[in-house]
């Protein structure tokens, strides 16, 4: 949102469109907050467990794969891509990244560093991705404060 960009002193061009068919000049960086099953929001939205089906995860994973492929095509050489979902499902997180790395030889992980985790360093995986679980709490806070579940990976293109 514009107010968040302003508050953080950042400038960005935001696009809201069908990214699977977007034709444009390449970008330096892309944030792909992919549509997902929202299983990471169960703490706040317990109905997700009853309204989402396994077939929903499968369909969403297919869409995420297409969005990832298109986002990678739209990156400049040495560009960066942050992929995230509010899903707890590996098919929508870790497996998406593994498969994208296999499909795109120029793609590489750009590991998230501990100091970038803002009090949730326990969520950092050995591969430098973030797997935030609803029972986690920011360092120094009670686990009762709760967070939504997320998966976050940062990727880059080699020259």
Q: What is each PLM-predicted segment?
A:
Residues 1-159:
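S-adenosylmethionine
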């Amino acid at each position: 949102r514009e107010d968040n960009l302003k508050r953080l002193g950042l400038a960005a061009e935001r696009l809201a469109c069908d990214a699977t068919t977007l034709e444009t000049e390449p970008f330096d960086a892309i944030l792909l907050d992919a549509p997902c099953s929202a299983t990471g929001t169960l703490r706040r939205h317990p109905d997700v467990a009853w309204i989402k089906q396994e077939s929903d995860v499968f369909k969403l994973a297919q869409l995420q794969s297409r969005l990832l492929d298109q986002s990678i095509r739209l990156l400049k050489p040495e560009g960066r891509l942050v992929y995230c979902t509010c899903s707890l499902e590996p098919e929508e997180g870790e497996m998406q990244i593994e498969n994208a790395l296999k499909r795109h030889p120029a793609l590489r992980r750009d590991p998230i560093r501990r100091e970038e985790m803002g009090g949730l360093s326990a969520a950092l995986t050995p591969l430098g991705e973030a797997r935030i679980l609803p029972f986690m709490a920011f360092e120094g806070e009670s686990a009762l404060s709760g967070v939504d579940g997320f998966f976050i990976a940062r990727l880059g293109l080699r020259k």
